[in-house]
Amino acid sequence: MILIEHILGNVKKDPVWQAKLKNATFDLLVLDQREAQKSRCRKSSTQGLDLGISLDRHVVLADGDVLAWDEKTNVAVVVQINLRDVMVIDLSELKTRSPDELIKTCFELGHALGNQHWKAVTKNNEVYVPLTVATTMMDSVMRTHGFQHLPFRFVKGAEILPRLSNSEARLLFGGAEDTDTHVHVASPLDEPHGSGLHIHGIHSHGDGHSHSHDDHDHDHNHDHDHKH
């Protein structure tokens, strides 16, 4: 096993490495979105190298990261991350609405996303939701819940990733397919010190009560009776 403890550079962002590897052969380490959030994992490259990734705790691998470079053979081990597409909901329009309308829409949007158990991150007046079902179904959920006035589109996950902090990337892309993960939806109003309204996914449980969650990432294994 080859131990990888440091990232040498990034062939997609660093001009020096772009020039150095211009004619190199890439041995890709292909990771899905969950694997990319781990600072420690073991996986083989496309050419069969047994790689043990052991990075600092808060270091996250990015698409194009160079993990190893052999000048003699002109071969570089490079990370390729396959991210899910993302639905982007634009909340800017809500700034023109009354406070009551803003609160109502944010609550209803959080409830709709929460009932679907879709992960979500809000940033810069947008909501990012990774695709876990067909786009037609996500489109249907938005329209049947009356959110036609909120523009939304579908983009590649790689387009959204640079806008996110490491913790936001872990929340959005780390295990997006887990249906028991709660949704966190914040206010469309950007406050300088993180203040403002925060609306979270709400769940109705078999024991007859419902609840919302504070702003933290956690998983629960329990049965739900959803009310739509």
UniProtKB/Swiss-Prot annotation:
Signal peptide: none
Compositionally biased residues, Basic and acidic residues: 204-228
A cellular component term, taken from the record's GO annotations: cytoplasm
UniProt cross-references to Pfam families, sorted A to Z: UreE_N
Lineage top rank: taxon: Bacteria
Matching InterPro entries: UreE, UreE_N, UreE_N_sf
Location(s), subcellular: Cytoplasm
Keyword terms: Chaperone, Cytoplasm, Nickel, Nickel insertion
GO MF entries: nickel cation binding; unfolded protein binding
Disulfide bonds listed in the record: none
Biological process annotations from GO: protein folding
Chain segments carrying region Disordered: 193-228
HAMAP family: UreE
Family per record: Belongs to the UreE family.
Alphabetized NCBIfam families for the sequence: PRK13262.1
Stated role: Involved in urease metallocenter assembly. Binds nickel. Probably functions as a nickel donor during metallocenter assembly.
Protein name: Urease accessory protein UreE
Origin species: Yersinia rohdei
Lineage: Bacteria, Pseudomonadati, Pseudomonadota, Gammaproteobacteria, Enterobacterales
Gene name as annotated: ureE
